[in-house]
């Protein structure tokens, strides 16, 4: 599992603590395209973002994928049900946590019962300590850190 990291240091002043922000890329899919296709047509290299959706009536650990503040899909649960939940907890716990998403292909049906899904790369960033915890999670075999 190859990891790609970038770090930025925010310089310390008397009143501002030093925060080390690290990022990693994860290959994934945006699920629910068949539901949201009337409001979103994904294009390769398009940028969208992930945002927690704790009031989702179907999944209280849902991570919505949004474009212009509108839901256009969700992150998948993953084969062991922990993928979206792990990202949800990370985004909720880390005040510097972000999930930027880049579309990498056209919608496909993977034959897993989740309908049409859009291939993407999640650009996850946050505090170095929180990213270390995220890296240690065994979310699923099909979602790999780059």
Where on the chain are the PLM-derived regions?
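Conserved active-site motif detector
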Residues: 1-146
